[in-house]
């Protein structure tokens, strides 16, 4: 076949683009490589081998940048076109394991007849079995592996994997034998010492502390010389030495090694996170956070270390949301420096037998990093926030102020809680508290457990929680002696305490003001100024809306909530509807009027059919105060909708951020396909996270369930996290469904005190007190007959009516009305 000149030229250009993409990939310029591969893949009529090369290249780049789901989609596309070979399926199985899709990995690998890569198939399938709790099947599978034809390295890998699985099953003696055999089969090198480090843990599990320490010390010696102290493998071995000492009961020594590990890990995160994608950061941190916080088990050995770890690890990902790469790309010089630093660190992290060359690469990267920080305020503040210590926080505390980091540690079956207390002198205390089981199973005065009451939607159960003095004492009594009378307490919760408003259980706390924070790290930052512009939305019309403002939107409509709600058969997508909230219109009007009276804040109030999702997206970024009075929702999944289903640790942000949201005008109608050109009236947490709310000093969510969400070390993955990611400051949110009228009164009192000059946390606490003590007069009957009028007929006979008197009552004194709302300082 003879090609025309034009066709030959087009073919040549395609080949050139493929070669350029390969070159970019090899150079580590993955984003540019993906664009080049995509350009090839989008061409029509190209040979299947070219398309395979382009899609495989995209998958490789996506995998390297942590975009594992995109990489998986690339392989699925290859498979759909009939181009996926055995190697591709093995790569696909690696992605399934990385993403935690173990059942999918089993479905892919079990029927696979691999003539090549049989060792990879067996190892990956065994790993999937082990993660699914089928450890016995995993070991049986590895036992059937044909070793004929395997290289010594492949045999060693197979044996090492058997050891890893045996160790996960608690079979430490067998694991030690397998790992020892594997180590003996491997040549001197990084791989051998990774196996040796795990052998050390297996020996520790057998109770052989001296053997374990000898193995781990040999690893540390080799890694320090050949990889350097900045290499992740060295840090991992340092941590494993700490774990061995901890298991042997040598807590003081363990704390010293954990301290070294924490220093190495913090430096690694500070060096690396600015050069990682969001997904790479998430994958790294969700895997490593439990390891960083293992030191909590050393308890009172070094409380200052534990406080610094809590300060660093809580909400870490929120601290690095700033897109350093995007900022660097705005300036040519900064962009070049960014790329140079990334390249130097990649090369140094590969490890080298030439220690001087490796150290030279690290040193040059550090020098260039100092130059980049001098050029970029964002990068400088990024590093400063990551390196805060308890001493930095102590300097921000007043004489009568105390900071508390609650921590949770231990295995899932035996989790414990403790409090790390910090005062203005810099002294850190460790206070052991309770186990998670004892807290969940605490028996309230009405006979129900705390776990049952928190899962319940009944108002009586909420009242039982927040009026139980024994529960309040259990939570706070051990901390009371450490606190100054009538001082201020700043606390950052952990675990179950995210879903429990313990600041509303402080009647016995010496009259202290209690303020909730995401992390006490926030004390190092100045509060944002609420003065500026306020946005108030309420009285939302859920049946109708004015959709015209979509024409002014800067982005295409986001209708992802519609499909999610439809799939889960939740309103309004599944023949349900959100009801109008009459008190929210008056709430919005009152707050606007209060703000307008001499506060110097310009207020915009949007109500009724105009209170659309699009209107919010357009108006909110320029506002310093935002008040949203509407419906809210949060759910875990269709099988586990109760609140405590959120207390899970292994969660992916992209899933959980689509399970909470707020409802805007027209939502009952706009979710229907006929309105596909417009926003659907449901603002998900994920959508909120993509907004720019840096100016917002305060966001008030006068709505139900806005404080709920799955719990991780990063805090609550609900709507509040979406706002935090968007840059919002303080947030008012709710833990359960709230009363319409009580909420209106609470919010108006809050703004009354806040605009009157009261500090935000005090204004919020006083507003709750006002609501509890709010009095109204009602007419009630007495037992005395009223003979001033004639008799009345009742139940077939004539009787005197009862006298009526006016009585003063407090209709909102019960916690069901005021305890749901929490103020979270970012």
Sequence positions of predicted segments:
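Alpha-helical solenoid repeat scaffolds used for protein-protein interaction
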Residues: 191-194, 198-459, 473, 487-508, ...
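Conserved alpha-helical positions within TPR/SEL1-like repeat arrays
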Residues: 18, 22-26, 53-64, 87-98, ...
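Amphipathic alpha-helical segments of tetratricopeptide repeats
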Residues: 40-42, 79-80, 113-114, 143-147, ...
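Helix N-cap/loop-to-helix boundary motif
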Residues: 48-49, 83, 116-119, 150-153, ...
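Catalytic cores of enzymes
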Residues: 372, 376-826
């Amino acid at each position: 076949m003879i090609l025309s000149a034009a066709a030959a030229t087009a073919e040549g250009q395609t080949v050139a683009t493929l070669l350029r993409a390969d070159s970019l990939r090899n150079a580590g310029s993955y984003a540019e490589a993906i664009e080049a591969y995509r350009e090839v893949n989008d061409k029509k009529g190209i040979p299947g081998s070219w398309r395979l090369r382009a899609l495989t290249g995209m998958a490789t780049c996506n995998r390297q940048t942590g975009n594992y789901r995109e990489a998986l989609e690339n392989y699925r596309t290859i498979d759909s076109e009939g181009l996926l070979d055995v190697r591709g399926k093995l790569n696909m199985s690696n992605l399934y394991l990385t993403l935690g899709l173990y059942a999918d990995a089993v479905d892919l690998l079990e029927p696979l007849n691999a003539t090549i890569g049989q060792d990879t198939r067996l190892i990956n399938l065994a790993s999937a079995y082990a993660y699914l709790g089928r450890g016995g099947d995993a070991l049986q599978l590895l036992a059937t592996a044909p070793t004929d034809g395997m290289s010594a390295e492949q045999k060693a890998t197979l044996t090492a994997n058997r050891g890893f699985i045996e160790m996960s099953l608690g079979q430490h003696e067998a694991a030690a034998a397998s790992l020892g055999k594997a180590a003996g089969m491997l040549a001197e090198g990084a791989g051998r010492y990774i196996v040796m480090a795990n052998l050390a843990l297996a020996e520790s599990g057998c109770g052989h502390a001296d053997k374990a320490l000898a193995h781990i010390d040999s690893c540390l010696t080799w890694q320090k010389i050949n990889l350097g102290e900045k290499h992740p493998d060295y840090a991992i071995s340092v941590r494993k030495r700490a774990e061995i000492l901890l298991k042997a009961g040598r807590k003081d020594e363990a704390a010293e090694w954990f301290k070294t590990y924490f220093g190495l890990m913090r430096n690694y995160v500070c060096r690396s996170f600015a050069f990682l994608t969001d997904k790479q950061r998430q994958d790294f941190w969700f895997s490593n956070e439990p390891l960083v916080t293992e030191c909590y088990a050393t308890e009172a050995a070094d409380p200052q270390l534990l406080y610094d770890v809590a300060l660093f690890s809580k909400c870490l990902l929120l601290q690095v949301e700033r897109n350093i790469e995007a900022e660097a790309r705005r300036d040519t010089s900064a962009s070049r420096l960014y790329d140079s630093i990334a390249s130097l660190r990649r090369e140094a992290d590969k490890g080298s037998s030439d220690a001087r060359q490796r150290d030279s690469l690290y040193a040059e990267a550090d020098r260039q990093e100092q130059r980049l920080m001098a050029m970029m305020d964002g990068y400088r503040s990024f590093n400063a926030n990551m390196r805060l210590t308890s001493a930095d926080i102590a300097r921000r505390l007043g004489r009568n102020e105390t900071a508390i980091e609650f921590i949770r540690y231990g295995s899932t079956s035996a989790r414990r809680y403790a409090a790390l207390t910090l005062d203005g002198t810099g002294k850190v205390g460790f206070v052991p508290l309770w186990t998670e089981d004892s807290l969940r199973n605490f028996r309230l005065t009405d006979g129900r457990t705390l776990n049952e009451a928190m899962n319940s939607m009944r108002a009586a159960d909420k009242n039982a929680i927040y009026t139980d003095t024994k529960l309040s004492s259990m939570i706070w009594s051990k901390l009371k002696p450490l606190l100054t009378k009538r001082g201020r307490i700043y606390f950052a919760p952990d675990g179950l305490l995210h879903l429990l408003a313990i600041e509303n259980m402080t009647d016995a706390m010496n009259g202290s003001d209690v303020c909730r924070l995401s992390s006490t790290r926030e004390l190092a930052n100045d509060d944002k100024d609420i003065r500026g512009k306020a946005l108030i939305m309420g009285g939302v019309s859920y049946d109708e809306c004015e959709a015209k403002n979509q024409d002014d939107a800067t982005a295409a409509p986001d209708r992802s909530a519609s499909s999610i709600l439809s799939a889960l058969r939740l309103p309004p997508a599944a023949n349900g509807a959100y009801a109008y909230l009459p008190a929210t219109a008056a709430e919005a009007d009152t707050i606007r009027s209060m703000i307008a009276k001499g506060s110097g804040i310009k207020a915009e109030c949007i109500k009724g059919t105009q209170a659309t999702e699009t209107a919010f997206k357009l108006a909110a970024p320029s506002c310093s105060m935002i008040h949203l009075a509407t419906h809210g929702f949060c759910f875990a999944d269709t099988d586990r909708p109760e609140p405590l289903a959120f207390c899970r640790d292994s969660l992916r942000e992209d899933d959980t951020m689509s399970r909470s949201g707020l409802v805007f005008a027209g939502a009952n109608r706009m979710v229907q396909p006929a309105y596909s050109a417009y926003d659907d009236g449901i603002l998900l947490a994920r959508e909120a996270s993509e907004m720019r709310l840096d100016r917002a000093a305060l966001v008030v969510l006068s709505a139900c369930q806005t404080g709920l969400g799955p719990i991780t070390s990063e805090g609550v993955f609900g709507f509040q996290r979406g706002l935090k990611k968007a840059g919002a400051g303080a947030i008012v949110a709710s833990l359960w469904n709230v009363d319409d009228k009580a909420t209106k009164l609470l919010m108006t009192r809050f703004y009354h005190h806040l605009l009157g000059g009261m500090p935000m946390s005090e204004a919020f606490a006083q507003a709750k007190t006002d609501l509890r003590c709010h009095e109204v007069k009602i007419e009630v009957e007495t037992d005395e007959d009223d003979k001033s009028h004639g008799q009345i007929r009742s139940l077939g006979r004539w009787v005197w009516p009862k006298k009526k008197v006016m009585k003063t009552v407090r209709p909102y004194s019960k916690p069901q009305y005021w305890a749901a709302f929490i103020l979270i300082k970012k």
